[in-house]
């Protein structure tokens, strides 16, 4: 899915005692392991006292085996200190799993989430698929803590999924698969067989839809939704009719890593577990070892040293034509920046040259997101946001990650999702 859709999920968020293991064909070749270790180090180094405390990163660190114990301890402390009132059900679910994977007691977070999910209902019968992402995380977290108490919640959630007819979303489908697989594997002995039948039916439906998103090159949806989809396809008790070539997917992801596509810490957190042979179902089985630093094996051939960068010109347009919004505009500016600069630098230079291009950002688990341009701000209630496009193609990276090329036309379009 497009980068913004992943960010949107962050706004809305956000086995029965046995360890799971991805299929052997998914194993990363030993020669490529330093490549995977390299992105893990990059992810762990993003953890600082001033950074957004991201539970997905802590889960990935613990499932993979953390290298940077100081970062691990800092992030654990930050999440333990988080205010439950500031968290959505998805964020609360992730935080519970992150603390569980750190062998820490989540305290009252579990009972709070339990109560919230008992009162949960979608906003409408055909709510967007992304509206089910946070509840999927919540059910997965609750399943790992008390599956029996979670059963009525999961049954209602599964029936709601069956009745929903909104367009399919790979990330949401993958997370729902993990949640319902946990419930399927933990149905109490002596319970009605109808529970297993219901969960199996929903899982079969979702997994078939995920399999329809597998591209010829192995990518599932897009490169940033592939990590969660790999987890889902590797553990589901209801495999799809279409065979999944896990090796092809793994090889393609490794190739994307070589090309530098995985440098955003959140994108690394979502792909790392699968590359390490783990899934979110392994969270309760993480063994917390005594404190000792582990030095990873990293790639031995560093890239070429820095060279003096030439300037490039980026054509930048801001556009708002939404009815009901007072200020309508379509303005274009040519901006000169150093080659290799991220899009954020382009926006800053445009703002310096013309106050009409003034913008504001918000920090999320996926990094900086542009929340306002020319005093027109996104609004969750109105489902409006600033979408960035290259030509007519939505960008799949954020402004702090995307690197524009010479004479590229970037448009920031105020639109609705």
Swiss-Prot record:
One GO CC term, this protein: apical plasma membrane
Family that this chain belongs to: Belongs to the eukaryotic cobalamin transport proteins family.
Tissue expression pattern: Gastric mucosa.
Residues listed as glycosylation sites in the UniProt record: 311, 330, 334, 413
Organism classification: Eukaryota, Metazoa, Chordata, Craniata, Vertebrata
Signal peptide: 1-18
Name of the featured protein: Cobalamin binding intrinsic factor
Species of origin: Homo sapiens
Pfam family, any one: Cobalamin_bind
């Amino acid at each position: 899915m497009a980068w913004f859709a992943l960010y949107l999920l962050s706004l809305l968020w956000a086995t029965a005692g046995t360890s799971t293991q991805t299929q052997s064909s998914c194993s990363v070749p030993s020669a490529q392991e330093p490549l995977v270790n390299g992105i893990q180090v990059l992810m762990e180094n993003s953890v600082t006292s001033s950074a957004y405390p991201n539970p997905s990163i802590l889960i990935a660190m613990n499932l993979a085996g953390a290298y940077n114990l100081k970062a691990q301890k800092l992030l654990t402390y930050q999440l333990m200190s988080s205010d439950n009132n500031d968290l959505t059900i998805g964020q609360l679910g992730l935080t519970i799993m992150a603390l569980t994977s750190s062998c820490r007691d989540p305290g009252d977070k579990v009972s709070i989430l339990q109560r919230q999910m008992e009162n949960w209902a979608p906003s409408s019968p055909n709510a967007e698929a992304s509206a089910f992402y946070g509840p999927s995380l919540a059910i997965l977290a609750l399943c790992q803590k008390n599956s029996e108490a979670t059963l009525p919640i999961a049954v209602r959630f599964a029936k709601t999924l069956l009745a929903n007819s909104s367009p399919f979303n790979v990330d949401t489908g993958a997370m729902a698969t993990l949640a319902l697989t946990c419930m399927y594997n933990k149905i109490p002995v002596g319970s009605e067989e109808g529970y297993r039948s219901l969960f199996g039916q929903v899982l079969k439906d979702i997994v078939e839809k995920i399999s329809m998103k597998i591209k010829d090159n192995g990518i599932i949806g897009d490169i940033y939704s592939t990590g969660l989809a790999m987890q889902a396809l590797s553990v589901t008790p209801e495999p799809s009719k279409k065979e999944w070539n896990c090796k092809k997917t793994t090889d393609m992801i490794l190739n994307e890593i070589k090309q530098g596509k995985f440098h955003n810490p959140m994108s690394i957190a979502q792909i790392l577990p699968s590359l390490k042979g783990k899934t979110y179902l392994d969270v309760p089985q993480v063994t917390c070892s005594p404190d000792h630093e582990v030095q990873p094996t990293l790639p031995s051939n560093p890239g070429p040293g820095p060279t003096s960068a030439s300037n490039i010109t980026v054509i930048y347009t801001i556009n708002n034509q939404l009815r009901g919004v007072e200020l309508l505009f379509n303005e274009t500016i040519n901006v000169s920046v150093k080659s290799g600069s991220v899009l954020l630098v382009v926006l800053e230079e445009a703002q310096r040259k013309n106050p009409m291009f003034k913008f504001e950002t918000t920090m999320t688990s996926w990094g900086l997101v542009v929340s306002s341009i020319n005093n027109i701000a996104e609004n969750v209630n109105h489902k409006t946001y600033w979408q960035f496009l290259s030509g007519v193609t939505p960008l799949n990276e954020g402004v702090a990650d995307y690197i524009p090329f010479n004479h590229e036309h970037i448009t920031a379009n105020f639109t609705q999702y």
